[in-house]
């Protein structure tokens, strides 16, 4: 099973979300920053690496806050998606790979076209079932 990790990054009441690039897989769909765990990495180490690559930041990966499984028709294997609470310096966040990144209020997340694997988590955030008391980004 493929392990994929994603970070919930919050600053000043907003959540960082990322739009995939035009022309790539799942183009222009929204997601949380993160990616595939490689080799012998732990999920937390994989997320820290992905955040360096995608956002140019050193992250403090906190507690696991949500876990789900999903199978895309385009993929041969099921994936396990693990969300972590993450602390970064908000002012240091740079868009390194996405079409765009945005800081959004949880009440506006449902307006975005998220990847299917992220939608259950987005719903929980919108209903305030998680994330409200998680660590926030510095800055």
Could you say what each language-model-derived stretch is?
Residues 1-16, 36:
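Conserved N-terminal beta-strand and adjoining loop/helix that marks the start
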Residues 9-10, 17, 86-88, 103:
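Conserved hydrophobic "DFG−1" position in protein kinase catalytic cores
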Residues 14-53, 57:
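Conserved Nudix-box catalytic region and its N-terminal flanking loop in Nudix hydrolases
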Residues 17, 63-66:
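A structural microfeature
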Residues 85, 94-125:
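NUDIX/MutT-family hydrolases
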